[in-house]
Design a protein with these regions (language model features):
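Conserved, structured core segments of small domains
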Residues: 1-141
Length: 141
């Protein structure tokens, strides 16, 4: 099972404040553990929303772009991981070991399971499955 681990933004990450060397060292060590355990597929930190944009698609077909920053930090992300684990419980166990909290003293991490091809059932036709497998092969290099 694959999970996306979402590190929620706070006022410090949204202000562009960088973690200190101690936290970066701890996070690097934790990432090494994830990699050695075969758990980490990928992950990145994100710039503040002030450097981003949102694209809204309306029912009428219109497209509206809103540049950041965005006010509701509880809805924003500061980073993410993609992990391959056996269960949600295993993902939770790993999340409990994340070097936290960040600068603000509190942190929130969300765990979301990623859809796999089999999750789509009958709508995943052989043609769609072949397309998906081909795309994944190209992405894997």
């Amino acid at each position: 099972m694959r999970f996306m681990i979402l590190l929620k933004a706070d006022k410090h990450s949204e202000a562009g404040e960088m973690p200190d060397e101690t936290l970066l060292t701890a996070m690097g060590k934790f990432n090494d553990e994830l990699i050695q355990a075969g758990v980490m597929v990928g992950g990145e930190g994100l710039h503040p929303s002030s450097r981003g944009a949102r694209v809204h698609f309306g029912k009428d077909g219109g497209v509206r772009v809103t540049d950041g920053p965005f006010a509701e930090t509880k809805e924003l992300l500061a980073g993410f991981w993609i992990w391959q684990v056996k269960s949600k419980e295993e993902a939770i166990a790993w999340v409990k070991r994340v070097p936290m909290p960040m600068l603000g003293g509190e942190a929130e991490i969300e765990i979301r399971q990623i859809f796999e091809m089999d999750d789509f059932g009958e709508v995943m036709t052989p043609e769609l499955r072949e397309q998906e497998e081909r795309q994944r092969a190209v992405l894997a290099g």
